[in-house]
Structures are given as structure tokens and as C-alpha cells.
Amino acid sequence: VYKRQQQGTPFIYQGQEIGMTNYPFDSIETFNDVAVKNEYNIVKAQGGDVNALLNKYKMENRDNSRTPMQWDQSTNGGFTNGTPWFPVNPNYKTINVEQQIHDPQSILQFYKDLIQLKNSDEVYTYGQFNLVDEDNPNLFAYTRKLNNKKVLVVGNLTDQVSKLNVPYLIENEQQVMLHNYSSHVIDFDKIQPYEAFVIKV
């Protein structure tokens, strides 16, 4: 939310819009990433901790972004009837486009709403950018202003409840444009874990 309302061209990498997750790597044999295999062989030859290396690369490797797109519950997630270069993530039966496309509460629908909001008003493209509460380490917050239009974009980057110090904005009437929590009530004193929203101020 807080990235896509900034200047520049937003992009979505395949699978991001349905919340595809990292592949469950369990051994070096499950990796195709050449850089991972090369470093593994070097560390192993030097008698290093290959288990620690594998744990690191479960999260930090290129293969996580190379798994087949998960379209539906069919073989290979509907990506191909052939043999894909990399196996489909085993969770494809629960995380796929078909499961989400008609669900108004899905990640896919949220991305659609996010794109629609970005395209709905030039304030999100050309509006002046100003940081808000910039010394707050837990929140990333800013306003975009164009002519007489102004929006506030906030994202809580932590798993902790945080407070946003914007008294001059709280006094004004707000219209919630997008919110990743089911409640559209914004409490500036209690920004919930990973809460993100866009409001007109």
C-alpha cells in the first residue's frame, strides 16, 4: 500500500498478487539456483556450516521467484501440462488465482483495489510527496498533495501496535480510500500490526 502510492511506475511480480509463498526447500538438491549450489560446494569443501547456509538460502534465493504461477488446483497449478523448469509450490491447491478471483476478501481483490485507487486520481501520480512522523521507526507515513486534494498513506512495518503523531490531520474529516484491515475505522493512537491504509484528509 505505502509503496504503490508513491511516484514512479508500480509493478507486480507474478504470484505477488495472490500471495504466493517461498518454496519449501529441504535440501541442496531441491535448489536450481546456480549461485546457491556454487556457494554450498565452497562452504562444504572448506568444512563450513552448510546447514546454516541452507537455512539462509531458504529465504534468500532466486528460485523463490521462479516457481510456476499458481492458476488453479490442476496439475502443476494449471501452469503447464508438461514438466516445468522448477516444481510448483505444494501449496498451489490452496493458493491460486481460481480460489481468489471471486473472493472479495482475497489478496487478489486487494491488489485490484490498490491498482484501481492508483489510477483513480492524479494525486497518486503527480502529488507532492511529504513524509509524516518521519522519526517514527515503526511507521512509514507520507502525504501526497495536488491542488486541493491531499491523501495520507500509512504503513505499520512491524508486528507491534504503534502510534502515528499527526494531530493536525486527525482534526480533519477523513475518508478511507483503502485499508487492509476489515474495519475501516482508523485509530491513529493504535495503528495495528502491519496495518496499512490510504485516507483523504
Regions found by a protein language model. Give the residues of each.
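Substrate-binding cleft of secreted/luminal carbohydrate-active enzymes
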Residues: 7-19
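Short, glycine/acidic-enriched loop or turn micro-motifs at the edges of active sites
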Residues: 19-20, 159
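Short, small-residue-biased leader/transition segments that mark boundaries at the very start
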Residues: 1-2
